[in-house]
């Protein structure tokens, strides 16, 4: 990624915590209020993730990126030069790569790059991610993520 990405670790920490909540789904006590959040999807193969990306991008009104398998096993990433989301092979990496939160994160990178030209995890990325989450998982899931970002001091 070009430029300084000073918020990367904080965003990852907030999203990891949020993703763990989505793994369980259901009722969440949020500062005395009851929220109901969905259980995140887990895609069993690359085609299922591709289909999901197509649907989400249609929903938010952006052209869908290519989705391809990635050789490495440690992370997914977005390639701006080819508008490609690269996801580790779900069969060999286990379930983490096929989690909905991972795919939404990469969709947010795609959207942010198309609209702002940015690849960092700054304010524009977080705004895109919150919009994508609100549209796909609902406002309560987005509220939890926003609180995670705020708690991780993503200014």
Walk through the language-model features, giving the residues of each.
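Active-site-proximal or metal-binding-adjacent scaffold patches in catalytic folds
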Residues: 1-101, 110-155
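Walker B catalytic acidic pair
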Residues: 106
